[in-house]
Amino acid sequence: MRAGEKTGVIVVDMQGDFTTWKKGTLAVNGADEGFVKKVADATAIFKEKGFVLYATQDWHPKSHISFASNHPGSKPFEAVKIDGRTQVLWPDHCVQGTDGAKILLDAGIFQAIVKKGQDPKFDSYSGFQDDGGAKTEMDTLLKTAGIKKLVVYGLATDYCVMATAIDAAANGYKVIVIEGLSKGVAPDTTAKALETMKAKGIQVLKEVDMKRIGDL
């Protein structure tokens, strides 16, 4: 059995609006053209080695609750209370059908692309479920494929990568996060995210190490 047969890869939100390369509306520092190429090259190698590839895609309606533009008097990056929940407000990003929402890797290499954040009432950092608890098809897809272990990376370390990795672990998968194939919004929250993931039993590797991934 090849090492990758029961191992899946989730590439998180590698979309134009999250990159400095595409001058995205919610660009993550360091997510430049070189970083995107590094992620694309690593993802191609995982494919060659028999890993099953999945992607998440932020896919918001214009009326999405997380957009500061939908909250008169509020500004991006403010936190507000909505129905008892704390909601961080963001610039409009990854609006359905826009260039900024497009995945920057070849879509053809993925077994499936799981869209998230389509419900205007709830944010969705995780590829498994939104903040309201509504599940995506991710867990069903992975279990149908017999995936037991997941390699997770992308944008951003301290938000959607962390949320996806934590939910993957909660759903019973062995999870490995590749720090060098991810970028975070801020250094302090990124460091905290890495520690939080480790505390939940998630393995964090600095870079791709096929032997360690196979052994974990």
Q: What are the functions of these language-model segments?
A:
Residues 1-117, 144, 148, 169-177, ...:
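Active-site acidic carboxylates
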Residues 107-145:
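Histidine/lysine/aspartate-rich catalytic loop segments that bind and position anionic ligands
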Residues 147-163, 177-182:
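Glycine-rich anion-binding loop/nest that anchors nucleotide
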Residues 92-97, 124-131, 154:
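Short, surface-exposed loop/turn motifs that are enriched in glycine and acidic residues
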